[in-house]
C-alpha cells in the first residue's frame, strides 16, 4: 500500500494509519456425512470487527471516539503489477458503518509516539477495488453480495 486516508462522516480524521477491515466468518452447523462434517451457514455471520490504529492524540482520534453510529470511509492506493509486467497504481475504497466497541487505551512514554487502537462493530461494509465492487454486506438490511453475486436474494424471496 502506498498511502491511505480515513474519513468519519465526510470529515478527514486520519492519514497513513493502520486499519483492519473484517472478513466474513460464517456460523457453522455440524452434519453427519461419513462422520461429522462442519458446513458454513451462508447468510449467518459471526460478529464483524474493525480496528484502526492511529498515532497521536488529536481531533481525528476524538472524532473516531464518538459513542454513536458512524459512517467511515477508507481510501487507499496500492501498487499493482499487470500481466504484461508493467506497474501501476490502483485506488481502493471501503465504506463502513460502525458502532464503537471499545475506546482505545492511551500509553504515554517520553520519547515514544502514542498509539491508539480503536475497535468498532461493523453493521455495513462495502469495498471497491479499482472502481469495481468486491463486497457489500449490510447486516441490518440482509444484504450479502460478493463479486457481484447476491447470496441473500434467494433467502429474502422466501420471506
Give a label for each model feature.
Residues 42-46, 66-68, 86-90, 110-114:
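A generic structural micro-feature
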Residues 49-53, 71-75, 93-95, 117-121:
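Beta-strand secondary-structure signal
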Residues 54-58, 76-82, 96-102, 122-127:
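Beta-strand elements of well-folded, non-transmembrane domains
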Residues 99-159:
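Mixed-charge, glycine-accented linear interaction segment located at domain edges/termini
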Residues 13-18, 86-98, 136-138:
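Short amphipathic beta-strand/extended segments with alternating polar/hydrophobic composition
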Residues 64-94:
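Short, acidic/charged, Gly/Pro-enriched secondary-structure junctions
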Residues 1-59, 97-108, 146-158:
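Solvent-exposed edge beta-strands and adjacent loop segments
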Residues 1-2, 69, 121-122:
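A short, compositionally biased
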